[in-house]
Amino acid sequence: MILYTLHNNGYIDFSEKVKLFPKEKLNMYVNFTNRCNCNCTFCLRHLKDDHKLWLKDGEPSLEKIKQAFLNAPMENVADIVICGFGEPTMRLDDLVKLLTFIHQTYPKFKVRMNTNGLSDLEYGKKTAVLFKGLLNTISISLNESNADKYLEVTRSRFGIKSYKAMLDFAVDCKNYIPNVVVTIVDIIGEDEINACKKVCEEYNLNLRIRRYEAN
């Protein structure tokens, strides 16, 4: 699925959900890529072919994604979320082009992106500026309270420097994106949650604790 939404603790094609609930406003999620530069211990990507969001035919082209938008019942959209079953910044050029298309074609919608925040390391340059005027919210996975724990969980291919780079990216995003949040899941324990809160205080970042969903 390219465009999907939530349904019964799982996922469903956006247009199919609209057929079931034609009067509802729904968040539209964009499944952009299955690639990632992390290999998180908790990641649902390990399910691969057993998961609805695994792109079995490979990554959809930018034109195919645009056409999916043009064919979708946009009158039922609440917000647009660039998320899916991989790290969206792995297709950075296409991502910026897609966000530009959304901004120009559907200017009334708020757009959020979920990311691991490692695009500066992936491309060897500052990347937050590329999202200026294109995102209303960026949600960045903090995961843990220090670099060692972060690397143990994310198994980032960039090693121990990943944690600081992610935090620096989050701070940089505040210069270009109205709403910047970092997230952790609620299963990491109270002590770790409190430690993450202290990190966010140090970096002046907004923390959101989200429920872990294994679906």
Segments the model singles out, each with a brief description of its role:
Residues 89-215:
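Conserved AdoMet/S-adenosylmethionine-binding subsite of the radical SAM
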Residues 14-17, 66-69, 124-128:
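A generic local structural motif
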Residues 64-85:
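Short Fe-S-cluster ligation motifs
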Residues 29, 44, 81, 139, ...:
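Conserved beta-strand positions in the central sheet of alpha/beta enzyme cores
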Residues 1-27:
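Short, charged low-complexity linear segments at domain edges
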Residues 18-64:
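Canonical Radical SAM [4Fe-4S] cluster-binding loop centered on the CxxxCxxC motif
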Residues 43-50, 76-80, 146-150:
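Short, basic/glycine-rich phosphate-binding loops at helix/coil junctions
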Residues 21-24, 72-76, 132-133:
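Flexible, charged surface loops at secondary-structure boundaries
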